[in-house]
Amino acid sequence: MREAKRAAARRGRRLRIMFVDEARFGRMNRIRPCWAPIGTRPEVAAQLIREYIYLYGAVSPKDGICVYLIMPTSNTACFQVFLEVLARKFARQDILLVLDGAPNHRCSDLAVPNNITLLYLPPYSPELNPKENLWDEIREKVFKNYALKSMDAVRAKLKQAILYIERNPKLVRSITSFPYIVNSL
């Protein structure tokens, strides 16, 4: 991280620290607890249709800014597109991108844009990535107990989730500002 800060300073640019991850969303819903009147048992439709799309996301815990991209799958080509979107969105800044060691994040075919530096988390440590908490928030607040009839409905729900997160930077900061992150900034 120190090297990334020095490199950004040499180039006269601001360093933005972001955490990235991807999550799978689809028609196979997970039933979650919910409130119901006393004496009644809530009914929730369930289905076992295995169709999925992926939501790539990056979060800046310092200011709560997020970037999302809906993709058909999770592979190196999709991750490459996401990196290019990030690089363009923050073209005047350097980005230290903290991520897990998934194979599509480490592929030799991956061309990392000039303003992005990758920093890998230790293996098997999703608890260190605050982006994971945002996936929980999306699943709890937007996808809770829905049986979606089509992949278009899943996409529409994802767009609703993106708007919910992007409109609430204060919430994002409260979910993602882990002490070890805030103290290092």
Language-model features, listed with the residues they occupy:
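Short functional hotspots at interaction and active-site rims
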Residues: M1-L185
